[in-house]
């Protein structure tokens, strides 16, 4: 619960220690290209740079839309969960804004079966937003397919997956359905079951959901 200035001040204290790290160069590249500031950020210059940036950010040309126009951005793709409403994508399009803002499909939480309570909570939200009653694995896939179709209608053509390790376990449909029932019922899965479920979901996203939606368009 700190102020914006306090956060910026701490970053200014940290920047000198990032020398030879990309963070050092990125920080000063952004200050120079976006704000025209050539000063080195450190504790001594922090307040001056902070005030100058904020003064410029109050101007229309430094708004989010103004900055995108300056850099000739044509398309912005956001990272979105299947249960996201995409309401701001719709509002932006309806406002007549010339730069396209499109969603991307990021279904990590639909694969996150490590904590049964969290997974069940997510599936319940998925059921609510999709209008599909979910009581088994096939129901969940139907709900995800419905959401994927909605994303496609809003211009989504890209998928983004946060894969922290490689997995391509062999599995059967019966195993995956049983694993879903187990975790949805509140029982923790084994490491092998987790990997099998994630492997199955990647295949399903690529073959049964993504490819089908693209083919229909």
State the predicted function of each range.
Residues 209-216:
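Residue-level detector of conserved catalytic or cofactor/ligand-binding positions
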Residues 1-207:
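Metal-cofactor-binding active-site regions of metalloenzymes
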């Amino acid at each position: 619960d700190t102020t914006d200035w306090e956060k910026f001040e701490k970053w200014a204290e940290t920047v000198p220690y990032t020398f030879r790290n990309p963070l050092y160069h990125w920080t000063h590249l952004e200050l120079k290209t976006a704000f025209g500031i050539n000063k080195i950020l450190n504790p001594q210059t922090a307040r001056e740079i902070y005030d100058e940036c904020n003064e410029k950010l109050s101007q229309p040309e430094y708004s989010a839309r103004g900055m995108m126009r300056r850099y000739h951005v044509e398309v912005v793709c956001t990272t979105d969960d299947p249960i996201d409403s995409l309401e701001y994508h719709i509002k932006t399009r309806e406002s007549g804004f010339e730069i396209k803002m499109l969603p991307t499909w990021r279904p990590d939480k639909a694969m996150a079966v490590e904590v049964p309570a969290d997974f069940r909570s997510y599936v319940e939200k998925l059921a609510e937003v999709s209008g599909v009653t979910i009581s088994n694995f096939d129901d969940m896939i139907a709900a995800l397919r419905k959401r994927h179709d909605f994303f496609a209608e809003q211009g989504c053509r890209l998928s983004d997956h946060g894969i922290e390790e490689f997995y391509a376990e062999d599995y059967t449909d019966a195993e995956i359905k049983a694993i879903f029932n187990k975790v949805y019922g509140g029982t923790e899965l084994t490491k092998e079951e987790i990997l099998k479920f994630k492997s199955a979901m990647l295949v399903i996203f690529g073959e049964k959901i993504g490819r089908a939606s693209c083919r229909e368009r």
